[in-house]
């Protein structure tokens, strides 16, 4: 160090000697006589920016990109990393000279050498130099002399010697009827194949069923006759008979045309608003979820093209010829797939029922009518179809509908075709898909359409590879591929060949081939339907079997990728992450990624698929360990002859709904996503309870996927919760000092049940990370430590006051306790003992208007504008009751004590009594209202006495304050009547010899039941859960009536003089 004298003291200064004249990568080596010279380890900035620290204190360091000046190089470096990362990559990038051989390059060159040697090529070094252009002949020669390289050569040759020769698998034509007859006559001399054995087992199962006892409309005897004659008449005749039978039990239904009267043109804005409200309410009654999503997504501007445009376009896409054969090796499975084509059981039928909300197929069979079929009849139908290996003609046809991909869809390619086959076909294919899915040893890199959280698996793998590369300064090249119309263009021949390669039973392969070659479809749009045609390619989106068939073809692709190419994560190599047709490739070198792209393109072209080069992109991360950094470089990669775009460090891209950059997951801000939708929900013609329902069940859950797998800060989550609470208060007209816990506590505990993203997001992330399954990275220490670190970070975020909120019940309990500790929420403490009483809060029923719901919520949380409430924190103001009572004007005083609301209190009490009385009479009880019982202790008048089967039940109703335990009040009421003199009087008066029981219907003025009271009434059969819910609403309404009566008479006061 050198020292210079300044007025403030001595400032140390480091002397730097710069090597080179520019900031380029062509730097000369440091000569031996300059070994003592010190120079920076990383040449990041131009030469003129290197100045002594003492001089830097006097002169500022400018940024060459934006011109901003800084006091030090460190400040400039921070600025470059945060504001100009792409320009910083350009400055940091170095040209490799005599770069080290990576393990991936060694494997690729060894495999290429084996290939060249097998082809009889000479001058191997020069030939290899042609393929490895970035390596010199001398470098290749030296590598070939190494022992580890020679071991790789021997290993590859050993694998080639063990690999069997595989012939191309082609689709043979189906045998003619005469050939089939000849095969039948010669079957006695040939051994029984597994296919014939399975058919015999299915037919034996059909004949072994016991007779079905059912209604005559199901024609059980006719179906049994078809089964008995099946082996004599053959499969074609059996199919025809089965088709006629299905038409008999499921009569063909015509197309339903609903006549909708066009709305009258509104005369003014009020009438226009009423019409909009009526339309939204009708849609709400039909399907709440669809109505909410249409309101949240804004105006749907999608317009389906006319039939003249849609039909030619999609018919050409679906009927284009596809490759007739697909070559590949036979995939070895751990166990046989013969179970796929075996007799269907009753358990299979129960597990594969079609949802009642699903649409019917062209045959008109609805899911409800299919469920009405006796299980014995349905078992026979399904197994007959299995035995025949084809579908009956009456259920072969499917209809294809189109759903828009975006709200601005206008072109034919902007719509997604969805096939809607018969409900019976969907149930049968669901059974076969479940069996096939559980029998295949799937490649661990394929996570789509499998019973696992595939999105979490693959999104976390991409994040792991990116972050691991930057942390350890390793090179990594990534390609995100977009398959154009993957489900609509897949070759049928590739499906059949893949099923054979995986060892699927012949009967199953024939069934798939028959359904695809013999099953037609018709295109349906807005009021039009095309003629039936048979698609020549593509899988049927909407059919349960289609995802599994597509997965099989993609699984075959993954098995063809070279295992030695890929990104190295610890001691494992991963080269692909697939979710159905979303494919991401990883490689350690540029050449390795190009090899993976070529392999993928070759396979996809064979199976009839194409890559959309414009939508594909690559990310090239170059590791520079000596400089302890990574840089993004724009390398050229090709799909065929088309170049793929290369992304920079700041470019964002989306994979499985999660935003990424080259450094990993991108910080997301959920407030930006939910803010506009909250505004749309505010303007929508909905009731307040409907807005809360939409917020709780649709809008907030839409954020869960991005919050669980993306990156989000705790502060951002708190701000989003604050934004949500602002709109909730606005919708319900709540004051600002309403407890926050009231918004987030669950309805069963007295709150509104709005999820708090601050706690829900880390909990969901921890749960999804805990469910991640990486079979190919199970023993990888790097992957395991990465997962554990991420889970621990989520756990740390869930620590609240020394308690870990690791589950949803724990979060709900946390908010409920905070609510009960507040002044306004203490009266809801006993609300958690019985859940159905809160149904009106969480479910948008027609019991309450929007105004009544808002007032009920304010009553529930003690937010009505009484004097005590409005003068809170200002004790100098008057708080006495405006009616002249010698008590503070509180909500409890108005509801329970004030003389002005006495009449409403009586009406509230009588309303509860009448509801219980009506329910008892519906159960066959004889009910006496307020009988006068003259006893030794005086006159007693219980509200209800119910007589049933010589048994007496005495019920008395009370609505109490919320300042005391309601269970204690319930017990006091029972003790009030459960006395010997009252029992004696009841037996004398009603001449009952049975038991006498005493009950109370105890609630507080908020509409909260005593847990012991309501549970005892329900257990004794004196009250239903529905009635308890209605009574809770009636008490709340009665309390509101008390308050309204008090406020209406607030101009008058009692003269106490």
Swiss-Prot record:
Keyword vocabulary terms for this entry: Aspartyl protease, Endonuclease, Hydrolase, Metal-binding, Nuclease, Nucleotidyltransferase, Protease, RNA-directed DNA polymerase, Transferase, Transposable element, Zinc, Zinc-finger
Pfam families xrefs: RVT_1
Catalytic reactions on record: DNA(n) + a 2'-deoxyribonucleoside 5'-triphosphate = DNA(n+1) + diphosphate
InterPro entries referenced in this protein's UniProt entry, alphabetically: DNA/RNA_pol_sf, Rev_trsase/Diguanyl_cyclase, RT_dom, Znf_C2H2_type
A Gene Ontology BP annotation from the UniProt entry: proteolysis
Positions of the UniProt region annotated as Disordered: 173-195
Ranges annotated as biased composition (Polar residues): 183-195
EC number: 3.4.23.-, 2.7.7.49
C2H2-type Zn finger ranges: 61-84
Protein name in UniProt: Retrovirus-related Pol polyprotein from type-2 retrotransposable element R2DM
MF GO annotations: aspartic-type endopeptidase activity; endonuclease activity; RNA-directed DNA polymerase activity; zinc ion binding
Residue span(s) of domain Reverse transcriptase: 384-660
The keyword Transferase is assigned to this record: yes
Native source organism of the sequence: Drosophila melanogaster
């Amino acid at each position: 160090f050198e020292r210079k004298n300044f007025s403030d003291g001595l400032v140390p200064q480091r002397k730097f000697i710069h090597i080179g004249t520019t900031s380029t990568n062509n730097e000369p080596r440091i000569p031996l006589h300059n070994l003592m010279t010190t120079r920076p380890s990383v040449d990041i900035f131009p030469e003129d920016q290197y100045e002594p620290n003492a001089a830097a204190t006097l002169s500022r360091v400018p940024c060459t990109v934006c011109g901003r000046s800084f006091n030090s190089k460190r400040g400039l470096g921070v600025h470059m990393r945060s504001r100009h990362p792409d320009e910083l990559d350009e400055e940091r990038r170095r040209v490799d000279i005599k770069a080290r051989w990576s393990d991936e390059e060694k494997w690729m060159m060894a495999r290429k050498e084996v290939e060249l040697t097998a082809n009889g090529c000479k001058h191997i070094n020069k030939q290899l130099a042609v393929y490895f252009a970035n390596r010199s002949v001398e470098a290749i020669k030296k590598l070939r002399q190494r022992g580890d390289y020679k071991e790789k050569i021997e290993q590859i040759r050993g694998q080639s010697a063990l690999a069997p020769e595989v012939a191309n698998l082609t689709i043979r034509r189906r045998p003619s009827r005469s050939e089939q007859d000849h095969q039948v006559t010669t079957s006695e001399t040939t051994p029984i194949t597994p296919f014939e054995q399975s058919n015999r087992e299915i037919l034996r199962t059909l004949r072994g069923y016991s007779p079905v006892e059912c209604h005559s409309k199901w024609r059980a005897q006719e179906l049994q006759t078809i089964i008995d004659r099946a082996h004599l008449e053959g499969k074609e005749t059996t199919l025809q008979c089965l088709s006629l039978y299905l038409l008999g039990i499921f009569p063909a239904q015509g197309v339903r045309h609903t006549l909708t009267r066009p709305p009258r043109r509104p005369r003014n804005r009020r009438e226009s608003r009423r019409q909009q409200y009526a339309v939204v309410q009708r849609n709400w009654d039909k399907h709440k979820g669809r109505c909410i999503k249409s309101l949240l997504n804004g105006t749907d501007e999608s317009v389906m093209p006319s039939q003249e445009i849609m039909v030619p376009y999609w018919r050409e896409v679906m009927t284009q010829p596809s490759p007739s054969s697909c070559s590949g090796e036979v995939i070895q499975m751990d166990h046989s797939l013969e179970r796929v084509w075996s007799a269907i059981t009753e358990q299979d039928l129960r597990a594969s029922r079609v949802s009642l909300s699903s649409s019917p197929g062209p045959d008109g069979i609805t899911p409800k009518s299919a469920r009405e079929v006796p299980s014995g009849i349905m078992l026979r139908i399904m197994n007959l179809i299995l035995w025949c290996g084809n579908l009956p003609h009456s259920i072969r046809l499917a209809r294809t509908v189109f759903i828009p991909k975006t709200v601005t869809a206008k072109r034919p390619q902007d719509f997604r075709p969805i096939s809607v086959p018969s409900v019976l076909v969907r149930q049968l294919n669901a059974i076969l898909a479940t069996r096939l899915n559980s029998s295949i040893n799937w490649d661990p890199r394929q996570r789509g359409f499998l019973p696992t959280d595939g999105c979490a698996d693959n999104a976390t793998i991409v994040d792991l590879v990116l972050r691991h590369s930057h942390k350890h300064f390793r090179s990594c090249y990534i390609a995100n591929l977009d398959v154009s119309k993957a489900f609509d263009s897949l070759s049928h021949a590739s499906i059949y060949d893949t099923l054979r390669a995986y060892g699927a039973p012949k009967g199953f392969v024939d069934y798939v081939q028959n359904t695809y070659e013999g099953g037609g479809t018709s295109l349906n749009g807005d009021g039009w339907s095309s003629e039936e045609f048979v698609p020549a390619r593509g899988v049927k989106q909407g059919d349960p079997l289609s995802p599994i068939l597509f997965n099989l073809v993609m699984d075959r692709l993954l098995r063809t990728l070279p295992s030695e190419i890929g990104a190295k994560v610890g001691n494992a190599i991963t080269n692909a992450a697939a979710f159905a047709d979303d494919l991401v490739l990883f490689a350690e070198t540029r050449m390795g990624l190009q090899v993976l792209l070529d392999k993928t393109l070759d396979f996809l072209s064979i199976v009839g698929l194409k890559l959309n080069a414009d939508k594909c992109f690559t990310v090239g991360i170059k590791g520079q360990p000596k400089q302890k950094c990574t840089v993004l470089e724009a390398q050229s990669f090709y799909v065929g002859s088309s170049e793929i775009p290369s992304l920079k460090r700041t470019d964002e891209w989306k994979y499985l709904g999660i935003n990424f950059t080259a450094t990993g997951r991108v910080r997301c801000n959920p407030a930006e996503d939910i803010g506009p939708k909250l505004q749309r929900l505010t303007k929508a013609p909905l009731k307040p309870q409907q807005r809360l329902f939409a917020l709780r069940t649709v809008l907030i859950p839409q954020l869960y996927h991005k919050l669980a797998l993306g990156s989000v800060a705790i502060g951002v989550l708190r701000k989003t919760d604050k934004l949500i609470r602002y709109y909730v208060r606005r919708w319900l007209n709540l004051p600002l000092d309403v407890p926050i816990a009231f918004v987030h506590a669950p309805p069963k505990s007295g709150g509104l049940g709005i999820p708090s993203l601050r706690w829900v997001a880390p909990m969901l992330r921890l749960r999804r990370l805990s469910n991640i399954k990486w079979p190919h990275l199970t023993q990888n220490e790097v992957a395991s430590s990465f997962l554990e670190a991420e889970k621990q970070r989520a756990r740390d975020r869930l620590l609240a006051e020394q308690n870990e909120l690791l589950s949803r019940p724990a979060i709900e309990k946390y908010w409920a306790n905070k609510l009960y500790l507040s002044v306004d929420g203490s009266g809801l403490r006993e609300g958690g003992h019985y859940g159905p009483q809160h149904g009106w809060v969480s479910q948008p029923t027609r019991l309450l208007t929007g105004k009544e719901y808002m007032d009920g919520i304010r009553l529930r949380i003690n937010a009505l504008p009484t004097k005590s409430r409005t003068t809170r924190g200002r004790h100098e103001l008057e708080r006495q009751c405006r009616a002249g009572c010698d008590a503070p004007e509180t909500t409890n005083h108005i509801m329970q004590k004030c003389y002005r609301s006495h009449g409403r209190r009586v009406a509230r009490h009588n309303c509860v009594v009448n509801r219980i009385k009506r329910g008892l009479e519906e159960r066959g009880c004889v009910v006496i209202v307020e009988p006068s019982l003259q006893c030794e202790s005086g006159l007693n008048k219980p509200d209800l006495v119910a007589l049933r089967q010589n048994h007496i039940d005495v019920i008395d109703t009370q609505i109490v304050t919320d300042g005391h335990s309601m269970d204690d009040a319930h017990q006091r009421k029972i003790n009030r009547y459960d006395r010997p003199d009252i029992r004696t009087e009841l037996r004398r008066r009603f001449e009952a010899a049975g038991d006498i029981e005493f009950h109370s219907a105890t609630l507080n003025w908020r509409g909260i039941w005593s847990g012991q009271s309501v549970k005892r009434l329900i257990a004794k059969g004196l009250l239903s859960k529905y009635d308890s819910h209605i009574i809770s609403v009636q008490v709340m309404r009665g309390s509101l009536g008390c308050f309204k009566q008090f406020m209406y008479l607030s101009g008058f006061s009692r003269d106490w003089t």
